[in-house]
Amino acid sequence: MTGQPKTRVSVRIYGQDYTIVGAESPAHIRLVAAFVDDKMHEFSEKNPMLDVPKLAVLTAVNIASEYLKLKEEYNRLREQLKKEKDGERDD
């Protein structure tokens, strides 16, 4: 990973400017930033009394929960596909 060129992208998340440095494309970094910004605004509307640090943690926890559910579903589908492929070989 040390040999990959790094991309620097300026983004705005919940009214704050950040410079994100990463190996992903600028478009991907902007997409991620927009997703986080949208989620923070979504949770802010539901919880208007939260300060920004608590809102950021709530957003991170919810995004992590979504990610883990998708990862679990991906693994389940992968196992199902493997079983189906193994079943075809037995025929």
Curated annotation (Swiss-Prot):
Annotated keywords: Cell cycle, Cell division, Coiled coil, Cytoplasm, Septation
Protein function: Activator of cell division through the inhibition of FtsZ GTPase activity, therefore promoting FtsZ assembly into bundles of protofilaments necessary for the formation of the division Z ring. It is recruited early at mid-cell but it is not essential for cell division.
Gene name, Swiss-Prot/TrEMBL: zapA
Intracellular or extracellular location(s): Cytoplasm
Primary subcellular site in the record, as a coarse category: cytoplasm
Coiled coil: 58-91
Cellular component annotations (GO), alphabetically ordered: cell division site; cell septum; cytosol; plasma membrane
Record note on quaternary structure: Homodimer. Interacts with FtsZ.
Pfam families: ZapA
InterPro entries with a match to the protein in the record: Bac_CellDiv_Activator, Cell_div_ZapA-like, Cell_div_ZapA-like_sf, Cell_div_ZapA_firmicutes
Protein name: Cell division protein ZapA
